[in-house]
Amino acid sequence: MSQIPSELKYAQSHEWIRSEGNGEYTIGITEHAQELLGDMVFVDLPDVGSEVDLGDDCAVAESVKAASDIYAPLSGEIIAVNEELDGSPELVNSDPYGDGWLFRIKAKDESELNDLLDAAGYQELVENEE
């Protein structure tokens, strides 16, 4: 069973969201998602400074099996991307909740967090998919 850290929020499309304070959030894909995708070969990240709306496809994770869109779980401005993934996309596989993070958003509307899943809700979603 995949790890589902309790301190994170989750989107139904398998992104995780961690608050960094000051309305800033780090986004990545869950361990479950990277297991389904398999070994990452390339991650196409959004441009720093670009605006995204909730649900926008803003990044792509390419693995040996498939290419998968990654959706913005919050509206806001992209304030950072994980440059390490440029040469080491496998970090998404080896450390999805740590060094394999994808991008950071300065949230426009933090009430959107209310629509995200907690760890128990995400666990239920994953179990219902299997």
Curated annotation (Swiss-Prot):
* InterPro entries in the record: 2-oxoA_DH_lipoyl-BS, Biotin_lipoyl, GCV_H, GCV_H/Fam206, GCV_H_sub, Single_hybrid_motif
**Any Gene Ontology CC annotation:** glycine cleavage complex
PROSITE patterns, alphabetized: BIOTINYL_LIPOYL, LIPOYL
Query: Which residues does the UniProt record annotate as the domain Lipoyl-binding?
Result: 24-106
Q: Which residue positions does N6-lipoyllysine occur at? A: K65
Cofactor needs: (R)-lipoate
Reply yes or no: does the keyword Hydrolase apply.
no
Q: How is the cofactor bound?
A: Binds 1 lipoyl cofactor covalently.
Which of UniProt's keywords are assigned here? Lipoyl
Which Gene Ontology BP terms does the record give? glycine decarboxylation via glycine cleavage system
> SUPFAM superfamilies, alphabetically?
Single hybrid motif (SSF51230)
Q: How does it assemble?
A: The glycine cleavage system is composed of four proteins: P, T, L and H.
Q: Which HAMAP family match?
A: GcvH
The UniProt similarity line reads:
Belongs to the GcvH family.
Question: What is known about what this protein does?
Answer: The glycine cleavage system catalyzes the degradation of glycine. The H protein shuttles the methylamine group of glycine from the P protein to the T protein.
Q: What is this protein called?
A: Glycine cleavage system H protein
The organism of origin for this protein: Proteus mirabilis (strain HI4320)
